[in-house]
Amino acid sequence: MNKVFKNSWALFLGMGAIMLAYGYQNALLGVRAVIEEFSLASTGFMMSGYFVGYFIGARTIPSVISGVGHIRVFAAFASIASLAILVHSIFVNPLTWFLLRVITGYSMVSIFTIAESWLNDLSLIHI
């Protein structure tokens, strides 16, 4: 058990930080939408973009991972997700935010998929 924890603590810590940061971003986008006086319909539309990207990513990410590799895909989509979050402050438009949320959803599902596959690889080694 100690060996498994010793080999996987960084993965859990990193994923915890990513999930915490995404949770803050998700909550603060709703607050920012109210401050910018978006309508309720446009706020709902904008926030639903995450799930559109998540659905598309869940269907396509396995082929991307098998084509390029886990580490490259993780690094690329972690960078893309952080860039999309930063661009929200530059463009204050519900349609732009919807597209950025699609990108964020696609990136997050790829990060989650890769972390899960790394965890599965670690558990298979130590069984």
PLM regions: where:
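Helix-breaking motifs and short loop linkers at transmembrane-helix boundaries and internal kinks
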Residues: 90-92
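Intracellular juxtamembrane helix-capping segments at the cytosolic ends
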Residues: 110-123
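Structural signature of the two symmetry-related core transmembrane helices
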Residues: 72-86
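Conserved small/polar residues in nucleotide/adenosyl-binding loops
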Residues: 125-127
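Paired small-residue
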Residues: 95-103
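Helix-to-loop junctions at the C-terminal end of transmembrane segments
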Residues: 57-69
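Helix-loop boundary and gating motifs at the non-cytosolic
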Residues: 5-51
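Small-residue-rich segments within alpha-helical transmembrane domains of MFS-like 12-TM solute carriers
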Residues: 19, 23, 105-113
